[in-house]
Amino acid sequence: LSEPRFIDHGEVTANVFAPDSRILEINSKSGLYPLYMAYSIYRARVKNSLFSVSSIEDEQRIWDKVVAENIFVICKTPMAKSITKRTLIGFRKAKINTRYFEDLINQIKNKPEHFIKQVDKFITDRTGIKNMKINAIVGNPPYQIMDGGAGVSAKPVYNLFIEIAKQIAPNYISMIMPSRWFAGGKGLDSFRESMLSDKRISHIFDYVNAKDCFPTASIGGGVNYILWDVNYKGNCSITTIQGTQRDMEQRPLDQFSVFIRYNSAIHIVHKCQSDNSFASIVNSRNPFGLSSNIRGEKTGEIRLITSAGISWLPKSAIDSTNHLLSKYKILMSKVTAEHAGEPDKKGQFKIISRTEIIGPNDVCTDSYLIVGASESKLVVENEYKYI
């Protein structure tokens, strides 16, 4: 390429990358985002003929001025700060606005007001201007931290970076994050409610398979990036990307309590809401009162289905008043996310790993759910076909 790739999105691009724009990245790791930001502003300065460019030295002078006046970067580690500096100015001596925040996640989570003051002080110290307005905040925040729970237990933190960016009050925010917040995610209920009710989110670009965005990363549920515009108030333009296919529709985010990622599914959801829900025949969790670690014997009157296989229990092990015991029913595994939540070769997701019809005197542990229940095997077979 004779020059780097440049993407123009009209008014937003013109505003964000104006010659006098100030852009902040939170959590730079390699400096690639600041590099693109610096190039875009450099391009705007040259295009607007603010500087005469007749030599490599002139180009270098303009570049250094952009990095010194327009780009501000916060890093989570000293190494990230060093790499970002090298990306922007190489090994030369030039002014660069980078700062390493020790324990960045903890500061944003537990001391947000203090963090905002420190960011303001950092920018004031570098520019000599108090309360400078940041035009845009961008970034690829950390996605999660281990929370010390049983087994592999991680808590999302990317939501904290979106929230702190809004508190800093720029004109624009654009960050990329996992798409799990659309409908789930540990501790993300209030964040999801806040996002879906925020009319300032003008665009969401949703990659159903994260590998379409990050080819070497496995991120269950995909990733998305947003454009938040302080001056926008309206429906959101939602683009869903699946391989080479793109589907775009403008619609409100707060139609439902969760975000429906597929535009084509909206009318289906509306139609289904007018009918009886399948949830009405899904039984409560652990209907037989058997924990997931229980294992039976080699013989008995009741067949026990566990994640380890088939065993047997005496009839006295189950409450005789349990209405499910004497009926046909559907055994179903709890929702899973096999292959790290990524689609298979056919682009399909495996959501339920096991479903089967079980009969009278068949029970299961808490590893499974029970759907439907009838003395008629035909009724249960029809319910099974629906699943």
Question: How would you label these PLM feature ranges?
Answer:
Residues N209-I387:
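C-terminal substrate-recognition regions of SAM-dependent nucleic acid methyltransferases
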Residues L1-I204, N209-C213, G222, I226-I238:
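SAM-dependent methyltransferase catalytic region
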